[in-house]
Amino acid sequence: MVHVIDGDTIIVKYNGKSETIRLLCVDTPESVHPDKRRNVSMGIVASNYTKKRLLGKQVLLELLPFNGRRGRHLAYVFVDGQNFNVELVKQGLSPYYTKYGISKYDTEFRKAEKRR
């Protein structure tokens, strides 16, 4: 793990390069948006949680075979054997985001939403 941009976007070393990864099926509140009015305190909480859980740790990426509309890799991130994307939902830091379709981990995400 190299750097946390915000609650749902990280930078990792991948194939010898720093690559931006957008976490799938989550959408945390804004914390580093260029329009400062869009940044909210829960976005900072989500960003700090992601830093606490991922910085300095080895993560496993389950990448989609294509990039997102902003050119970022799209992935499920696993840390300590757990799906971190689902964890963000379970912690109440993101909804289960299905704008682009349901997840292969749909059951886990739906259970996580109910635990909030």
Question: Which functions belong to the PLM regions below?
Answer:
Residues 1-116:
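Small beta-barrel nucleic-acid-binding modules, primarily SNase/OB-fold domains
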